[in-house]
Design a protein with these regions (language model features):
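C-terminal motif of bacterial Sec signal peptides marking the signal peptidase cleavage site
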Residues: 20-23
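Bacterial N-terminal signal peptides that target proteins for export
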Residues: 1-13
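Beta-strand cores of secreted/periplasmic/IMS beta-sandwich domains, seen most often
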Residues: 49-68, 94-110
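N-terminal edge beta-strand
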Residues: 33-54, 154
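Extracellular/periplasmic metallocenter environments
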Residues: 38-41, 88-130
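Bacterial signal peptide processing site
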Residues: 25-27
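Mature extracytoplasmic or organellar-lumen-exposed domains after removal of signal/transit peptides
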Residues: 125-373
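Beta-strand signatures of extracellular beta-sandwich domains
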Residues: 72-74
């Protein structure tokens, strides 16, 4: 999963789009003077799994050297994901950039025989100068986060009540609306590693005895046709989204993290919405798709003034690409929602994927522009 880092004074730039992992976020777009570090994904995990670097901007260049067991590299500070590249199947490569302070970090390549390594960063780094435009972007996006977590709680309350009451049809009707606000802010929500698996894990993401949240209820509603045994799950889900609402109010943000989140929301579309994996029982994937795109656009809008100062033509292209994606989605609307994902043809999904790829290619340039001195 993709996550916006939450560590103070950290700058992060990353791309993890499955559909275009080898093409976006190249190291040529990295901040000037960045240290470039190359890693391979193998059956063993990250190679090398012990590395050193000076404090400051670092570009992580990651390539899958032929393994199906390991498809991502994460840099962790404790249990917090600072940056990652994911969905790298055999032959694909990707990059992400971080500005790291002195300290010891974990290199995590899940699935390898030796999953964890160490990155030691030495020396000092200068604190970022105050930037009124960046501060305005942070304030704007924080308001968006708080608005959507409020909507998430408000939509989850009646959904959970319907599940607890055993009203299958009402719960089915309310399910898509409860998903929307979470999907809009997914990278920030995922940064809270304890909460996200409880709220949004899919059946194959966690051990069977840890499977909770939206998708466990989704399976019960659409596969089993009952809410039997789901009351504790619904109560737990409601408690977790309320905890997320509280945590979002104090999350630390940087402007570049917001820009990175815009990219990572498109990565969510490529990795799980275009494939139909996310809502595999209800098939309301296009609801999630639109919410991810809306969240990406909101994050971009927050940092747009910063980007416009340096590349106004890029801003115009990104705005046009967002409109193209919405236009492609519009052709699949039905009533107040969308057709089931299973009704899409191969040509339909190809058109949607191409729109996301075109948008992501342009949007991936934004974080590097923001961190330029």
């Amino acid at each position: 999963m993709s996550r916006i880092p939450v560590r103070p004074a950290l700058l992060a730039v990353g791309v993890g789009l499955a559909a275009i992992a080898s093409g976006c976020g190249s190291s040529d777009d990295a901040p000037a003077g960045a240290k470039r570090m190359s890693f391979e994904l193998t059956d063993a995990g990250c190679v090398p799994n012990k590395a050193k670097a000076p404090a400051g901007p670092i570009v992580f260049e990651v390539e899958n050297s032929g393994t199906s067991k390991v498809t991502e590299l994460e840099v962790l500070d404790g249990e917090t994901i600072l940056g990652e590249v994911e969905n790298l199947s055999d032959g694909l490569s990707g990059t992400f950039s971080l500005t790291l302070e002195q300290g010891e970090y974990t290199l995590y390549c899940p699935g390898g025989s030796d999953e964890r390594g160490t990155l030691t960063v030495s020396g000092g780094s200068k604190a970022a100068a105050s930037n009124p435009a960046a501060e305005a972007a942070i304030a704007d996006y924080r308001s968006y986060l708080e608005q959507n977590t409020g909507e998430l709680v408000a939509a989850t309350e009646p959904f959970a009540a319907a599940v607890i009451a055993g009203d299958v049809e009402r719960a089915k009707r309310l399910y898509p609306a409860a998903r929307v606000p979470y999907e809009r802010i997914e990278p920030v929500a995922e940064s809270f590693g304890d909460l996200d698996p409880r709220i949004d894990a899919r059946e194959n993401d966690v051990p069977a005895d840890e499977f909770e949240g939206f998708h466990k209820i989704e399976r019960a509603l659409w596969v089993d046709g009952t809410t039997a045994g789901m009351a504790p799950v619904a109560r737990g889900l409601l408690a977790d989204v309320k905890e997320l609402q509280r945590k979002v109010k104090t999350v630390d943000l940087e402007a570049v993290q917001i820009a990175n989140g815009a990219n990572e929301l498109l990565g969510e579309v490529s990795a799980s919405k275009i494939t139909g994996e996310e809502e595999r029982y209800s098939h309301v994937d296009l609801v999630d798709f639109e919410a991810n795109v809306e969240g990406s656009e909101a994050a971009f809008d927050a940092v747009k003034p910063l980007v416009k100062e340096r590349d106004p033509e890029l801003v115009e292209q990104i705005e046009a690409d967002f409109e193209a994606v919405y236009k492609a989605l519009d052709s699949h609307r039905r009533g107040n929602g969308f057709v089931a994902y299973t009704e899409l043809s191969e040509a339909d999904t190809r058109e949607l994927a191409q729109g996301i790829d075109a948008l992501a290619e342009q949007l991936s340039q934004v974080p590097a522009l923001i961190v330029q001195p």
